[in-house]
């Protein structure tokens, strides 16, 4: 008590209360030993906890650094056609309706386009289409068959960038020139021919749109497009539709297997038969040879 009174009189600071008060309570040697031991355990536990937290943090950082999640494939992950780099001057020229510089000279592309359209007309077995699809041997039937093959060529050549698109325009130009020339040879009146040409032009763009939608969808969509355009909604035998869908699919596969550079330079296309006798031959296309000697 005397010690407590002395402390109060001297107004000992708070920091001095702890050692002073510890003298008020008698502590045995055993308790002192346990207190020192508990303090040592607490210090070691705190060090261990800090070490474990640091270790866990390091492991987590390491795991976050080297952990790879499974990536879902999207359309952008697959190989896409490389777009041509076009300068601003070329963009301005093409926006005005002119054709900018191309990969090859225009006269070579025009010759290749003429050859490709000629292959659509001369290398197609029209008699087989007339027989198996039960089509009348008329000018309209010829136009529908030619239109189908020209469309397949357009789909293939559009994959070859700006040069391929320019070639597509030339192919369509040669097609309309041929249609007009055949109409005159048949003796069709010029007024009626002009009227029919306008009607066929509308049907052409409608058919291209329908075929594009059909080739990008399943066989049902392609069959519907062929039924509307090729058969003029008059096909009653589903086997004819099945045959034509199979023909378009295998022909597009065959065209895709051809080298784009060869097609741009030669324009030579080999058409598969309507009824395939050797399906394995589709995977082995013949490479055309380019020869511009004398041109």
From Swiss-Prot:
GO terms for cellular component: cytoplasmic vesicle; mitochondrial inner membrane; mitochondrion. Keywords: Cytoplasmic vesicle, Membrane, Mitochondrion, Mitochondrion inner membrane. Induction: Repressed by bFGF; in embryonic stem cells. The keyword Mitochondrion applies. InterPro entries: Ubiq_cyt_c_chap (IPR021150), Ubiqinol_cyt_c_chaperone_CPB3 (IPR007129). In the brain it is restricted to the olfactory bulb, the hippocampus, the piriform cortex and the Purkinje cells. GO terms for biological process: mitochondrial respiratory chain complex III assembly. It is found in: Mitochondrion inner membrane; Cytoplasmic vesicle. Its main location: mitochondrion. Interacts with UQCC2. Interacts with UQCC3. Forms a complex, named COMB/coordinator of mitochondrial CYTB biogenesis, composed of UQCC1, UQCC2, UQCC4, UQCC5 and UQCC6; stabilizes nascent cytochrome b/MT-CYB and promotes its membrane insertion. Forms a complex, named COMA, composed of UQCC1, UQCC2 and UQCC4; activates MT-CYB translation. Forms a complex, named COMC, composed of UQCC1, UQCC2; UQCC3 and UQCC4; mediates MT-CYB hemylation and association with the first nuclear-encoded CIII subunit UQCRQ. Required for the assembly of the ubiquinol-cytochrome c reductase complex (mitochondrial respiratory chain complex III or cytochrome b-c1 complex). Involved in cytochrome b translation and/or stability. Belongs to the CBP3 family. This is Ubiquinol-cytochrome c reductase complex assembly factor 1.
């Amino acid at each position: 008590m005397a010690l407590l009174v002395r402390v109060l009189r001297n107004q000992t600071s708070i920091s001095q209360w702890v050692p002073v008060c510890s003298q008020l309570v008698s502590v045995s040697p055993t308790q002192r030993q346990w207190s020192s031991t508990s303090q040592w355990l607490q210090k070691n536990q705190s060090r261990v906890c800090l070490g474990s937290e640091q270790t866990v943090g390091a492991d987590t950082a390491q795991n976050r650094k080297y952990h790879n999640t499974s990536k879902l494939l999207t359309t952008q992950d697959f190989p896409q056609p490389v777009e041509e780099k076009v300068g601003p001057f070329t963009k301005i020229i093409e926006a005005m309706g002119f054709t900018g510089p191309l990969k090859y000279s225009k006269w070579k592309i025009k010759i290749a386009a003429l050859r490709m359209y000629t292959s659509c007309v001369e290398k197609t077995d029209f008699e087989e289409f007339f027989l198996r699809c039960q089509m009348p041997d008329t000018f309209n039937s010829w136009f529908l068959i030619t239109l189908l093959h020209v469309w397949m060529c357009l789909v293939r050549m559009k994959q070859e960038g700006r040069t391929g698109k320019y070639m597509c325009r030339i192919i369509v130009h040669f097609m309309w020139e041929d249609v007009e020339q055949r109409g005159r040879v048949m003796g069709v009146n010029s007024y009626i021919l002009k009227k029919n040409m306008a009607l066929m032009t509308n049907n052409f763009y409608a058919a291209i749109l329908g075929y594009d939608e059909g080739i990008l969808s399943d066989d049902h969509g392609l069959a519907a497009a062929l039924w509307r355009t090729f058969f003029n909604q008059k096909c009653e035998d589903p086997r004819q539709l099945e045959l034509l869908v199979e023909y378009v699919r295998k022909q597009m596969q065959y065209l895709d297997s051809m080298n784009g550079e060869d097609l741009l330079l030669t324009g030579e296309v080999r058409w598969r038969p309507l009824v395939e006798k050797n399906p394995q031959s589709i995977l082995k296309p013949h490479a055309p040879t380019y020869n511009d000697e004398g041109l």
